From Swiss-Prot:
Residues the entry annotates as binding 3-methyl-2-oxobutanoate: 42-43, 86, 116
Enzyme active site: 185 (proton acceptor)
Catalytic activity: 3-methyl-2-oxobutanoate + (6R)-5,10-methylene-5,6,7,8-tetrahydrofolate + H2O = 2-dehydropantoate + (6S)-5,6,7,8-tetrahydrofolate
Principal subcellular localisation of the protein: cytoplasm
GO BP annotations, alphabetical order: pantothenate biosynthetic process
Lineage: Bacteria, Bacillati, Cyanobacteriota, Cyanophyceae, Synechococcales
Gene Ontology MF terms: 3-methyl-2-oxobutanoate hydroxymethyltransferase activity; magnesium ion binding
Functional note: Catalyzes the reversible reaction in which hydroxymethyl group from 5,10-methylenetetrahydrofolate is transferred onto alpha-ketoisovalerate to form ketopantoate.
A Pfam cross-reference name: Pantoate_transf
Enzyme Commission number, as recorded: 2.1.2.11
Xref: PANTHER family: 3-METHYL-2-OXOBUTANOATE HYDROXYMETHYLTRANSFERASE
Gene responsible for this protein: panB
Protein name: 3-methyl-2-oxobutanoate hydroxymethyltransferase
Length: 257
């Protein structure tokens, strides 16, 4: 699958389903679950590496984990999900030349076929435009942007009219720049619906209601593996409790043998 194929999904009213992955096991599970795309998100900084935010993640980290995810795939290459890698904090906010260099390393060194970039500020717009002109597909990401939490916090975005207009304008700009898709995070359902109806490229929601063209979730959140759950992700299973229960039972049984 290529990034441009996601536009066909929208034209055909076919829902896009995505999960995050961070190693070969989570990559294999996502593939076997028949998702359309796998996002190697910077959330792995917290899920896998134990950091309190996404900010410490490095370029080397994202390359390492993207390769690990791809090694978990078992299907024929044409049946494998599309792999998209997040660009870590300060790998694209450092000027166009450096951003091209770093994004190029991700594409050259992994099986990722696109990168995801947060925000739509004028400086970021220039970077996105340059990357696309250089042949690197870009997925946009607006609404709640976790890499900006030191300034914006982690609260829901788009609740005021001013904020809604800003997000709608950003979505339009990202489409015009050439993004093949946009993640909408933690915004009101009706705002996401309005954006979805306006754009010709697909919107993929996380905490943005059911009107988006697709949905993405952090797999560890969905499986209930994290202590701190985001308000917009209801676990489908309390995985941590289940695993701990079974492991404790095994430990006790082994002690008795």
């Amino acid at each position: 699958m290529l990034p441009s194929d996601l536009v066909k999904y929208k034209k055909n009213s076919q829902k896009i389903i995505a999960l995050t992955a961070w190693d070969s096991i989570s990559g294999s599970i996502a593939e076997q679950a028949n998702v359309d795309l796998v996002l190697v998100g910077d959330s792995l900084a917290m899920v896998c590496l134990g950091y309190k935010s996404t900010l410490p993640l490095t370029l080397g980290n994202i390359i390492y984990h993207t390769n690990a995810v791809s090694r978990g795939f078992k299907k024929n290459i044409e049946e494998q999900p599309l792999v998209i890698a997040d660009m870590p904090f300060l790998t694209y906010q450092c000027g166009e030349d450096k951003a091209v260099e770093y994004a190029g390393k991700i594409i050259q060194s992994t099986y990722a076929k696109a990168v995801k970039i947060e925000g739509a500020e004028p400086e970021i717009q220039k970077v996105i435009s340059r990357l696309i002109r250089m042949g690197i597909p870009v997925m946009g990401h607006i609404g709640l942007t976790p890499q900006s939490y030191l300034n914006l916090g982690l609260k829901k975005q788009g609740e005021s009219l001013e904020s809604q207009e800003k997000i709608k304008k950003e979505a339009s700009i990202l489409e015009k720049l050439g993004c093949f898709s946009i993640v909408l995070e933690h915004i009101p359902d009706l705002l996401a619906k309005e954006i979805q109806n306006t754009l010709t490229i697909p919107t993929i929601g996380i905490g943005a209601g059911n009107y988006c063209d697709g949905q993405v979730r952090v797999t560890a959140d969905l499986l209930g593996l994290n202590d701190d759950q985001p308000p917009f992700c209801q676990p489908i299973i309390q995985g941590k409790e289940l695993f701990m229960k079974k492991l404790k039972e095994w430990v006790e049984s082994e002690r008795l043998n």
